[in-house]
From Swiss-Prot:
GO molecular function terms attached to this record: rRNA binding; structural constituent of ribosome
UniProt protein name: Large ribosomal subunit protein uL22
Entry keyword annotation includes rRNA-binding: yes
Gene responsible for this protein: rplV
GO terms, biological process: translation
GO cellular component, one term: cytosolic large ribosomal subunit
NCBIfam families: rplV_bact (TIGR01044)
Cited function: This protein binds specifically to 23S rRNA; its binding is stimulated by other ribosomal proteins, e.g. L4, L17, and L20. It is important during the early stages of 50S assembly. It makes multiple contacts with different domains of the 23S rRNA in the assembled 50S subunit and ribosome. The globular domain of the protein is located near the polypeptide exit tunnel on the outside of the subunit, while an extended beta-hairpin is found that lines the wall of the exit tunnel in the center of the 70S ribosome.
Transmembrane regions: none
Subunit structure: Part of the 50S ribosomal subunit.
Record family assignment: Belongs to the universal ribosomal protein uL22 family.
Species assigned in the record: Levilactobacillus brevis (strain ATCC 367 / BCRC 12310 / CIP 105137 / JCM 1170 / LMG 11437 / NCIMB 947 / NCTC 947) (Lactobacillus brevis)
Length: 118
């Protein structure tokens, strides 16, 4: 007999925010319940907060629709950020020169799973 699935995940790829900045937000919600994590994200004044909230809501929707899990029982079991491809640009400088600018992107993954009993 197949095992019962107790987790669901969502990923946002190539988001135009540096992974270092997203990690500050991700670290706030790891291990929290879904309701608490969404409340934290709503009141966190960082540019990555709405993006992480969107990924979290997507993971919850995946859990509800694909695996029939209850929203109240879900916790953020895993949340991590990886670096995406870097967009390389040039900024004009004095005397006809130019400096390289790295526009960094990130891949955001959030995994929600049911609370452990006990």
């Amino acid at each position: 007999m197949a095992e019962q699935v107790t987790s669901a995940q969502a990923t946002a790829k190539t988001v135009r925010i540096a992974a270092r900045k997203v990690r500050l937000v991700i670290d706030l919600i790891r291990g929290k319940s879904v309701a608490e994590a969404l409340a934290i994200l709503q009141f966190t004044p960082r540019g990555a907060s709405p993006v992480v909230a969107k990924v979290l809501n997507s993971a919850v929707a995946n859990a509800e629709n694909n695996f029939d899990l209850d929203r109240q029982d879900l916790v953020v079991s895993e949340a991590y950020v990886n670096e995406g491809p870097t967009l390389k640009r040039f900024r004009p400088r004095a005397k006809g020169s130019a400096s390289p600018i790295n526009k960094r992107t990130s891949h955001i993954t959030v995994v929600v799973s049911e609370k452990e009993e006990g």
